[in-house]
Amino acid sequence: GLGDVYKRQLPALSDETLTRFYAEQPELTTYRRPIEQVRRRRAHILSPECEALLANAGEMADSPDAIFGVFHNADLRFPAVTDGAGAEQPLTDATFVPLLQSGDRALRRNAFETYYATLGGYRNTLAATLDAQFKQLRFFANARRYPSTLDAALDATEVPVSVYDSLIESVHANLDKMYRYVALRRRLLGVDELHMYDVYTPIVPDVAEEISFEQAKATVLDALAVLGEDYTAMLREGFDRRWLDVYPNVGKRGGAYSSGIARPHPYVLLNQTDDLDSQFTIAHEMGHAMHSYLSCKHQPVCTSDYVIFVAEVASTCNEVLLMRHLLRKSTDRRERAYLCLLYTSDAADDKA
């Protein structure tokens, strides 16, 4: 097809020829970025026959991800769990973290152990699915002559492996801060041994409150007002025109997600639980949605997309602005401590 011709012909052009084309046809400069992207990866473009073969294998190669998605979002069911008083609580992907945030340690332990015991019952299926994913990644990396699957994964984002390695090294070099935080959490919770089901529950008690979706939207709008009237007007339109699928439902995928489609606008998936964490999730995902909307509005389709390393800047910025707003508004020391500890645990957990 035309796309294959495009990928084969562009790398063959010399830099001088391209410079002349840009000078003779200035409208081509709109496509300079995608052209450079194709040429940058010329060493990994194969013969027409090989490219056709890899293209036809693409749908098959997506099978591990598709299988896991159907299993996890549609077929998997968790049994109810009991709290310290013996009452049953529903366990789903959407309720898992809120249950782990409970002050009832028995409930936290039961939720954690039941969740992973249920997944463990499918360990062989999950292992085989993961193995299939590894094999397809290795196949395409080898086929395109990358030295490793890591090089292949990072190439599209133009992030050197050295940057990836330095991030890991930086985390390891600063683990002493994490150890201090974990020790503080264990001491404040008053437990002899800190378990994974203890790392979500607030260590400043009696501060968490129910925050409705309407309240959360209003607070997020206030917090992001510093970004200007144009931004908040479009954000309000996104709320009012139902860009968001808000509440959990049977068969709905867990977590939160923002689609980056250009028309008519991005769509945001949430699993609202009416708490502070959900409020931050709204700010985070609408950061993605606004980024996509504004990028598509002000740039041509060929340059409007962005890589994950850039995407998380917009979403994390919104979270930071929301945290700043909440801290500035609060005068209660306990509430401020709760907010700071929440953000510390979120950073450690990497919920983004």
Per-region residue spans from a language model:
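Long, amphipathic alpha-helical stalk/connector segments used for oligomerization, subunit docking
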Residues: 327-345
